[in-house]
Amino acid sequence: MNRYWLTPAYEADFDAKVADINGLYKQASELAKQGQRFESIDEMTGVRALERKHPDLPMLPGKVERREFEYVRHGTLAFIFNFDIVTGKLAACTAKPTRNEQDFLAHIQGRVAAEPQIDQWHFVSDNLNIHISESLVRYVAEESDLDIDLGVKGKSGVLESLSSRA
C-alpha cells in the first residue's frame, strides 16, 4: 500500500472555495465595467538568465542561420506575473533575483499604484506563504480602509497563522 505524503488532505470547504473563484471569474467582465480589476497572479522562479557569448550569423543563400552553443550565465531570476482575467493578457511582470515577502508586497503595491483609477482590486493566487504574509495582510487592510484589530503574528487574530489569513 502506498501513502502519498506530499498531497494535502482534502479540505471540507474546498468545493465552496472553488465555487467562489469560479463565480468571480464569471462576474469579472461585468464588474470590470464598474471599475473593478481582476488579475490572476503566479510566479516562475529559478529562471536562468543567459546571454549568447557570440552573435548569431544570419542566413545566407544556401545556408541556415548559425548559432554558437556557448553562453554567459547571469544567475537566476524570479518572475511574478499578473494576468488580466477579463482579457487574458499579461497585465504586469516583475523580475528580480529573489521572490520573498517584500518582493511580492512591492509587486502588489506597484500594481495598485500604477492604476489609481481602479476602484477595487481582486487578485487571485494560490496560498503560497508570501501571498498571505503579514505585511500583505496589513497593506490590504489599510488600502481597504478596514478599521479592525488584525492581531499579532503567531499569537492572535487574523495574523495568528497562515490558515487564518487564507
Locate each region found by the language model.
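Short, solvent-exposed loop/turn segments at secondary-structure junctions
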Residues: M44-G46, I85-G88, N127-I130
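Basic nucleic-acid-binding interfaces
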Residues: I41, T98, W121, D147-I148, ...
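Short mixed-charge
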Residues: E142-A166
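Charge-mixed, compositionally biased segments that are often intrinsically disordered regulatory tracts
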Residues: M1-R73
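Electropositive, glycine- and tryptophan-enriched low-complexity nucleic-acid-binding patches
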Residues: M59-D119
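Generic enzyme active-site microenvironment
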Residues: S40, N82, V124-S125
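Acidic/histidine-rich, metal-coordinating catalytic segments
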Residues: I118-I132, G154-V158
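A short acidic (Asp/Glu
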Residues: L50-E51, I132-V137
